[in-house]
Amino acid sequence: MPHFLAKLDCKPLEYPIISGDFCFHKEFSSLKHPTKSCVYASFKDHIFLLQKIRRANDFLIKSEKATPLKREILKQALRIYAQSFEVILHNLQENSKHASGKKALDLEDFEDFIKENQAPILMEIGFGSGRHLMELAKNNPTKTCLGIEIYTPSIAQVLKQIELLDLKNLHVLQGDGRLVLESIPHHKCEKIFVHFPVPWNDKKHRRVLSERFLDEALRVLEPNGFLELRTDDTLYFEDSLKLALKHFKSEIEIKKNAQIPVVSKYEARWNKLKKDIYDLRIYSLESNETPFNNHAFDFSFDTITLNQKSVGMILKTPKIIKEGYFVHVCNIYENKGDFLVELSMGDFDWPMRLFVLSVKNQVFYLNKSPLKTLNNHKAHLLLQNILKEFDEYNHCSE
């Protein structure tokens, strides 16, 4: 991660610090950890935060992962901010010009991407090395191929291949496919592939394929489109088949040890060991005419006023856990009556780290709202109730 270390004996900084398209507006101090602060900054219209940590012998300044920037822009921001310090060490050198220019989709732009896309969508959730996903894109140039993956190394590997092979119809998104599906309108996908997911036989609630996931997949698929599971785990296959048979109307196709054109490294290893591999295709049979209404999920806040007394009480609030979602106030930062609230919240399957900014009586998410899913919206309403409770308490005690 780009960062730099600086000597402690620097003069107090005078904000704002402006250089070209960058502006470092002000510094928020942690109310929980006296050695931590957040620098509130912007690049053009994009807001981001830097973490500033005072250690025994130096300052550590690095990005805040909850407000990501493209790597080269982040390095440039840190290089500019570092000019106000006596730098001891850094890793802010410019990258080679041959570095990949292809970027993953941003979650905040994903809704617009889906809305604007007119081509049939082939989706793979958990694409690993990307062999199958890239073959899909090469063989279907008129269709949009979308890969969803959690792990950064897999995404970086596929992004390089997309650029090398000039696969303009292939896009990748970093996220949990279980939640991403919930944000997609009805009948947007032609096919969904889930190949060799982690079986999680001892922790089945962590599996990709669950009753909730299957319902969402069948909703998102076009009529006669299919969800394809490929697995070497017999128990996972059997449990998934039982889930499919729970539906009142089902069309299911099963294959065992079928030969397919693209074999992953993982699958090749099992083939050598003569291990059975199962294919389960579950077809979407019904058309859903009900309007997709995730726009009903409003992530704005009512008018709320925070002050030193209320944020002190909010910071002491324990993690609140409900069925399927939670809210945890991790930290609060302050600058002259303005507050940054650091949160972990949302769906248990994919918790989010994000920040809420309070300026005067306005409260809003920094940069982006949570992904529009039911459990995220429930967590948002819970957070709003927490903030309003202490706001109302302060008004009553005045």
From Swiss-Prot:
Record-stated family: Belongs to the class I-like SAM-binding methyltransferase superfamily. TrmB family.
Source species: Helicobacter acinonychis (strain Sheeba)
Stored PANTHER family: 3-DEOXY-D-MANNO-OCTULOSONIC-ACID TRANSFERASE/TRNA GUANINE-N 7 - -METHYLTRANSFERASE, PENTACOTRIPEPTIDE-REPEAT REGION OF PRORP DOMAIN-CONTAINING PROTEIN
Protein name (Swiss-Prot/TrEMBL): tRNA (guanine-N(7)-)-methyltransferase
Keywords: Methyltransferase, S-adenosyl-L-methionine, Transferase, tRNA processing
E.C. number: 2.1.1.33
Binding locations of S-adenosyl-L-methionine: E124, E149, D176
UniProt keyword Signal present: no
Binding sites annotated in the UniProt record for substrate: D232
Gene that produces this protein: trmB
GO molecular function: tRNA (guanine(46)-N7)-methyltransferase activity
Disulfide bonds: none
CDD domains for this protein: AdoMet_MTases
Catalytic activity, as annotated: guanosine(46) in tRNA + S-adenosyl-L-methionine = N(7)-methylguanosine(46) in tRNA + S-adenosyl-L-homocysteine
The protein's role, per its UniProt record: Catalyzes the formation of N(7)-methylguanine at position 46 (m7G46) in tRNA.
Cellular component GO terms, alphabetical: tRNA methyltransferase complex
UniProt-listed InterPro entries: SAM-dependent_MTases_sf (IPR029063), tRNA_(Gua-N-7)_MeTrfase_Trmb (IPR003358), tRNA_methyltr_TrmB_bact (IPR055361)
UniProt xrefs under HAMAP family: tRNA_methyltr_TrmB
Pathway listed: tRNA modification; N(7)-methylguanine-tRNA biosynthesis
